[in-house]
Amino acid sequence: MRDFFAAGGVPTRSAGDALALRAPGPPTREMTRILGLYDLAELDRLEQFYEGGRFWISLDPEAGLDSELEQRGFTANDAWQKFERGVEPHPAATALRIGEADDRLGRVFAEAYGLSPSTFATGWISAVVGRDGWHAFAAFDGDEPVATGALYAVDDSGWLGLAGTLPSHRGCGAQSAILAARIDRARELGLRRLVTETGTPRDGIPGPSYRNIVRSGFEPVYLRPNYAAPA
């Protein structure tokens, strides 16, 4: 996430191992949060970064800070399922063409989530195209990109994210095929491990993202709790 924020020129703040993220616009659990928190003294230093506004803490379950955060008024606010797999090939078929994304990446991603194409995030997300360590893909219907996904590679590991599909092209196998392309790229790069995450099943029913991830060979490894700061 540090490099993703750097790509958009969005400042972050660090304290020890912890990293505070704060994207422009309304706060969201994904983009207004603290990562890598293992010491409450670091939280004391980072809270001021949010200027009294809302933020979340994505907590490593091994940090052992759950009870301390609850004592401070933080509340559990949905966990994320973390997944991991190797780089073995994953067969996937679609009538869409899968290829390298271009500067339309951000627009398609924004529209996939109902955001205005003029939002700040559009240019920010497109900034990862061609950036060191990033490998952005799209599914194309003719010449038009209709779905997105990216791989960020560091050392022998890769993170998969920025997945989105336009409503008009959901159910066409775009995300499974983009997942397969990113796995292939990871193998070409000599990576050994891939990680990703998504929301947990609601009422025991997994969402489309969860199902696509599992179908592509990822194994659930742990739940990462998110804690909302007191209002």
Locations of regions flagged by a protein language model:
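A short helix-loop-beta-strand connector motif used in the catalytic cores of GNAT acetyltransferases and
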Residues: 4-16, 51-54, 77-80, 128-137, ...
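Conserved acetyl-CoA binding element of GNAT-fold acetyltransferases
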Residues: 27-38, 156-167, 226
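Short amphipathic alpha-helix that is part of the acyltransferase structural core
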Residues: 32-41, 80, 89-123, 127, ...
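Conserved acetyl-CoA-binding loop-helix of GNAT-fold acetyltransferases
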Residues: 41-47, 162-165, 171-188, 211, ...
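N-terminal charged segments
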Residues: 1-51
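Acyl-donor-binding surface of acyltransferase catalytic domains
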Residues: 37-102, 196-197, 202, 206-214, ...
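A conserved beta-strand-loop-helix scaffold within acyl/acetyltransferase catalytic domains
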Residues: 116-168
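Conserved beta-hairpin
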Residues: 11-16, 61-72, 133-147
